[in-house]
Regions:
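A glycine-rich, acidic short-motif signal
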Residues: 1-57
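Short, flexible micro-motifs
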Residues: 40, 167-169, 229
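Short, Gly/Ser/Thr-enriched beta-strand-loop segments that form substrate-interacting elements
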Residues: 101-108, 210-230
Length: 230
């Protein structure tokens, strides 16, 4: 490619190494093995919970070029489906961030994973960083607090959030509010193809935090675990 490779980010909350590898392979399908110019980051591009465009861009630069992979990326690649190609798209220039570009030719539109998959992953793994990213996308902890209380039909005083992940003793949710939120989610899903088990861990089927042998949870129960040491 004689010129810059422009990445126009759209605030994908779960763009991780696997996504970078897939994007690298998609770029190579266009016959692009080397970019003579820069990797230009435009918009909100997040990767591995890094929100700075240049920092996230450098991670992407590594992800699309297997010749530069760290041991961590190689281990992640080995868990991907058999036959997944190892992309080799080399960037000759630098990673830079710009508000916009004057002239661009679109070649690829990379879609995020479906939100239902992202939420299931977040809850099964109890991924605090991902929860924080989603809360940020919605407007922050206080916006989430207000929307959750309204949806659950409980006073806002029963839901107190200082961050999006719930990590920290300052976050407080009453038992009634926690139960009401589950009921509200199930009610919301009634007009969709999904059920609440598509969003939360299911005991006996999902791993993540449910693998703790000290938990005595009936098989098939839909739950959300939470542990916090002060």
């Amino acid at each position: 490619l004689q010129g810059d490779l422009v990445i126009n980010g759209g605030s994908d909350p779960y763009f991780v190494w696997e996504e970078a590898i897939a994007l690298g392979n998609a770029i190579q399908k266009w016959g692009i093995n080397q970019v003579r110019g820069n990797l230009v980051m435009v918009g909100n591009f997040w990767m591995n919970n890094r929100y700075d465009n240049v920092v996230a861009g450098k991670l992407l630069q590594e992800g699309i070029n297997s010749a530069t992979w760290s041991r961590n990326v190689r281990s992640i690649y080995k868990r991907m489906p058999a036959g997944t190609l190892m992309p080799k798209v080399a960037i000759a220039g630098s990673v830079i961030s710009q508000k916009s570009v004057s002239h661009k030719i679109p070649i690829i539109r990379h879609k995020s994973l479906p939100l239902v998959h992202i939420l299931k992953t977040m809850n099964v793994e109890s991924n605090n960083d991902l929860a924080e990213t989603l809360a940020k996308k919605l407007g922050g902890a206080k916006v989430v607090q207000r929307k959750a209380a309204w949806s659950a039909g409980v006073p806002e005083a029963e839901i107190k959030l200082v961050n999006g992940s719930g990590l920290g003793v300052e976050n407080k949710i009453s038992p009634r509010a926690a139960t009401a939120m589950f009921v509200a989610i199930q009610r919301y899903l009634q007009t969709s193809p999904w059920v609440i088990a598509d969003l939360f861990p299911v005991s006996g089927y999902d791993t993540g935090t449910l693998t703790d042998q000290s938990r005595t949870i009936p098989q098939g129960a839909v739950v959300k675990t939470g542990t916090l040491n002060d």
